[in-house]
Amino acid sequence: RSRRQRQMCIRDRYGSGRKARSVLDDAREKVASLLGCEPIEVIFTSSGTEADNIAIQGLYAAGQTNRIISTDIEHPAVRDTVSKLEKTGAAVDILPVDRSGHIADLSVLDTLADVATCMWANNETGAIQPIEEIATRANATGTPVHVDAVQAVGKVPINFSDLGIASLAASAHKFGGPRGIGLLLAKRSPAPQPIAYGGGQERGIRPGTVDVAGASGLAAALEESVSEIAAQGERIAALRNKLRDGILATIDDVVVNSAEPCLPSHLHVSFPGADGDSLIMLLDSFQIEASTGSACSAGVNRMSHVLEAMGVSEAEGIGSLRFTLGRLTSAEDVDYVLAHLPEVISRARSV
């Protein structure tokens, strides 16, 4: 089918419109089969951020307790949404995490809330959270659970129907699909109230013209990534472990912040005595791209809210790096990093 057909309005009754509708239906059914849900539960969005906003704001609006449960390690898409609702009157209770970045206490789930929101896997450390336990505990009180699975979809097996959660967000570019397209899996009951209004597309939960080409690309990428979860997970984990072990063997005073259960793609490491900005610039001089665990506020570097929630010291947090590996990462790439990283750390610590 041509890209032009995919760009036609799915509500048009002429031939190309019907073909566009068929492409969208195929994409929806494929996503449903891959993620273990019904096609009607698949809602296409513009991003994972939009999906998180629809779910959290929509489930909160549908509730009556004015209470939200979340964590202190969420992505800004969730963290800022919860903060906005708190400023408008929501009471927010936090699921605490331990030093490994995993949720350590589920007791706040024992009281009913309008929504409990938790990421499946952390974008900085890769820590995988006990989603099944969270859902079971929340379901006992009737609290709907939303899961930000942007980091997890395509990397871990997911069966939405078996999880017992109300909604789940994902973004295509995180599993090799096009940018600008995401998805929200949402049960018919409890369903999020719409936070925008218009043409009534996507069950009225996400009104607006659907990006049919994007949805088709999302479904194709998801099919490929899901088929490779086991093989790629094993390969990437081996490379991640090689990188971790090499760092520990060649550099003194290193703190590994990524702890199992963890995504195979993530390695978060602290180098006390080094500054994150210096690390990034020095790595860039060798064409090595990594992320710092700190954030910039008014020109002053500070460690991320994720590390703060974990209880990481300031010295460790400021000098931290996140390495992410993927399907294109090779053993030669890891060897190259290990060949240059000791020099980078030494120079950064001497600044």
What is each PLM-predicted segment?
Residues 93-154:
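Active-site phosphate-binding strand-loop segment of PLP-dependent enzymes
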Residues 302-351:
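PLP-dependent enzyme catalytic core of the Aspartate aminotransferase-like
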